[in-house]
Amino acid sequence: MSAAADVIVLSSSPDRIPNGSPVLPAHDPAKLFDLSPPSASSSPVRSPSELFQISTRSRFFELETPSRNKENKTPKEPPVRKVNTTSKAKSASSQDKPKRRGRKPASESQTVLGDSGLAGLAQQSAPKKTAGARKKRVDSEGKRGKATNRTIMGRVAKSGNVQAKPPQEKIMDVSTPNALPPTKPASGVVSLEIDGLQLETAMKRRIDWTPTKDTTARTVESSQQEVAEANPQSFGSLLSEYGFNDISSAQSDVRNLGDDGPTKRRRIELVDSRLFGSSKPASHDIDDKNLTEDSQQKQPEPKQKPKKQTKKFTTLTARVTASYLNNSHEGSDSSSKETTTSRENAATSRTRGSKRKGKATSKPKEPEFIVLSPEAAAKSLENQELIFGTCSQLEREDSPTSLKELQAAISESERYAVAEPSPLSSTLCATPTSRFTTARGLWSVAARDLEGSLIRQTEVVDLVDTPEPAKMTTSTNDSRNEKALEDAATVPPKEPFDLPKSEPPKLKAIPAAKKEPSPAPGMPTIKASDNLKGTTSQHSKPQPKMPNYNGFTDAELSRQVASYGFKPVKNRKAMIDLLQKCWVSKHGKGTTFETQAGSQNTSTEPTPVLTSSEPNTSQKQPRKTATSRKTAAKSKTNPDSNPPPKINSRKTPSSSDATKAPSIQSKPTQPPPIQSLSNVEEIEDSEEETLPSPFRIQNRYTPQPPETRQALPVSKTLYSPSRPKPRTTKSTTNNSATLNQKQPDLADQIFKAMHAQPAGTPSRPSWHEKILMYDPIILEDFATWLNTEGLGLVGEDREVSAAFLRKWCESRGICCCYR
C-alpha cells in the first residue's frame, strides 16, 4: 500500500513529478515492445498494440468493462466523459498541457503498480482515475485517433478542452452501443451544472451568431408588414422629411435600435440602407403624439438658424440671395409642420396633407400680386432685388418682338435682292457717297447686312415705292444721273474726285454722263438722260448677252471656267464651249440671237459704239460686281451688240446731219454727240490710270483716240467694215505687251499654280503634298508640269526652266534635285 500511497501523492502534486514522468513511459514501449510512442502510430497499428498493452495502459480499458458490469460507479464515469465532449471546446490547448503534465504521472505511477500486480488499488482509485487520469487519456486517444475533427472543431471555439471529445463519443458508441445513448440527456444536464461559467458563455456565443440573425429577420418581417399596411403614410413621410426631419428620424432610429448594446453602429447602417422607410412608420405608430411634439419642438430650431445667418451677411451677393434663402426655409418649415399634422391622421388625411402643401406654397405668392398702398410700394422699391446686366439685354427681354421685326426687315430687303442682289448693295452703298455731307451715326454704320449694305436705308431710299427691283435700279440711276448732270454743269472737275469713294463701276457711268453737257448744259442733259433711259430700258431685254469668248485669252478663259466651279481644261475650244453652255444655262437661250444681231449691225456704225459702250458697261457692271471677269467679258460684247437700238434712238437728230455735213458744229443737235465721243475717249484714258489691272477689252480702245478724232469729220460708214478686224490684231499685241509689263512675279505664280492643282491620290500626290511630305522634287518633272498644266491654271503664259525652279525651291527651303 506504500506504492499506492505514493501514487495518490503523485497525482495530487503534479509539479515535482513531470521531471521524472517522461522517463518512465519513454522506457516502457521501447523495452517491452520495441515500438514507437503511440502518438506517432497510425490507427491500424493500434489493434495489435492493444493486445500487448494490457499490462500498462490498455489494462484500464479492460478493467472498465467488468467494472461497468459489476459496479454502479463506473456507468457514472463515462457520461462524465460525454458531458465533457458535448459542453467544452478544443481551443484551450494551453490549458491541456499543464493538466497532462500533472495527470500523466498518476497514470505512469499506476503502470508501476500494475507491474507489481496490484489490481485492488485500481478499483479503490477508480473515482480519482475517472475524474483526472481517464479523462485526459480519452482526450489523448481522441487526439491521436482523429486529428482532422480536432483541427476543424478547434477553429470554432477555443474556450475549453471539450470539443476534442465529441469524436470520442462516436468511438465509444462503436465500442459500447448499448450503454451510451441512454446516458446522453442526463450527462448534458449534469455538465451544465458542473462546468460553470465558461460553458454557459460559450453556449451563448454559439447561439448568438445564428439567432441574432433570426431576431433581425423577425424585426424586418414585422416592419415590412407595417410598411405594407401603411405605404401612403411612409411615402408621404419620406417626401416631407427631406428638409429638416433628419435629426428626429435619426434619433428615432437610435431609440429603436439602442437595446442591443455593442452592435449599434452596424444595425444603424443596415437600417439606413434597407429599413429606412419601414423604421419611421414603426416609430410613428409607437410614439405618435410624443414624436409630433418632439418634431414641433425641433423644427422651429432650423428657422432660427438661417435668420441668424441673414443678419451676419455683409456681401452684396449675400444680401441679394438672402430673400431666396428665407423663402426656401419658410417653405420647408411649413411643409414640415404639415407633415407632422398629417402623421396623426389616417392615410387619406395624409394624402390630403400633400395637397395642402402645394396650396401652402402657393398661398404666400398670392399677396405679392395684391395692389399695395403707396407707402408699401415705396418700401417694396427699396427692397427691390438688384439685377445686373447691360441695358441692351434688358431691352431685348422687354421687347420680344424686336427679333421678329428684324427678321421681317431682313426678309423684305431680301425680296428685292432675290433676282439681282448686287444692284441693291451698290445703290445703297452709293447713297452715303452722293450725300457725303449728311450726318452719320453709329447706328447707321453698324446696321448693315452681310453684304455690307445698310439695313435701315431701305426705308430712306426714294425707290421703295417701286415694286420691281429692275425698275427700282433704273429709276435710281436715272434720278441720280440727272442730279449728277445738273451738278456737273456747275462744277465738272470736282465730281470725279468725289465719286471714286463709291464703287468703281459707278466711275464709268456718272463721269461719262457728266462731261457730255459741258459745252451746252441745257439740251445735252435731255439726250444724256434719254440715252441712259434707253440703255436702262434695254437692260431688261439685252442685259444677259453672251460675251465673245473667242476674244478672251487663255488665262481669262481659265478664270471664267474656275468661276463656274469647273476644273481647268487644256483645250481652248473645249473651254469656250463649256463657258457658252454654262452661260446659256444660267441666263437663258433667247439672248444668243441678240448677240448675233448685234454682231451683224456693228458694221453699219462703229463710232457711236464708242459713245455708248462705256455707259452700257457702267450700267452692266454694277449688276455683275461679283466678279470682274464677267464685267470685262460683257463690256467686250457691248460694242458688238448694244449699238443698234441706240442708233435707232439717235437717228432722229443726227442721221441726216452726220453724213452730209462735214463740220461738227453746223447744227445745234449734232455737237453734243460729237463732244460726247471725244469726252468718252478721255474718260477711257483716265480709266487706264485709275484701274490697277486693265483687261483686254478696256485696253482695246487705248490706241483709238487719235484715230477716232481723225475719223470724226469723215463719214462714219466708210471705215466701219475694215476697222474692227485690225483692231483685234493690234489689241492682241498691245494686250500681250501690257500684260507682260504688269504681270505678277513668276515665283508667286508658281506658288499659286501649285495650290490650284487638285488634291492627288496616295499613289500620285500633288506637288504641294510632295513638298509637305519633304519628298525631293525632280526639277525637270516640275518644270514640265508647270509649263503644260500648272501655270495655265493661274492664267500664266510664261514658261519656267529647271534652273529657275531650283532657285525658287532653294529660296523656300524645298528639297529638290535634278533627274
UniProtKB/Swiss-Prot annotation:
Mention any Pfam family matching this sequence: Slx4
Q: Where is the composition biased (Low complexity)?
A: 36-49
In its record, the post-translational modification comment is: Phosphorylated in response to DNA damage.
**Record's keyword terms, sorted:** DNA damage, DNA recombination, DNA repair, Nucleus, Phosphoprotein
Which residue windows does the record flag with biased composition (Polar residues)? 83-95, 212-237, 313-329, 337-351, 532-541, 592-620, 650-668, 729-741
Span list, region Disordered: 1-187, 207-370, 466-553, 591-741
Skewed-composition ranges (Basic and acidic residues): 59-80, 256-272, 282-304, 495-506
User: Which portions of the chain have biased composition (kind: Basic residues)?
Assistant: 352-362, 621-633
Q: Where is the composition biased (Acidic residues)?
A: 681-690
* Entry annotated with the keyword Cell membrane: no
| Cellular component GO terms, alphabetical | Slx1-Slx4 complex
Q: Name one GO molecular function term.
A: 5'-flap endonuclease activity
What is one GO biological process annotated to this record? DNA replication
Q: State where it is primarily located.
A: nucleus
Lineage top rank: taxon: Eukaryota
Cellular location of this protein? Answer: Nucleus
Q: How does it assemble?
A: Forms a heterodimer with slx1.
Similarity comment: Belongs to the SLX4 family.
Q: What does this protein do?
A: Regulatory subunit of the slx1-slx4 structure-specific endonuclease that resolves DNA secondary structures generated during DNA repair and recombination. Has endonuclease activity towards branched DNA substrates, introducing single-strand cuts in duplex DNA close to junctions with ss-DNA.
- What name does the UniProt record give this protein? Structure-specific endonuclease subunit slx4
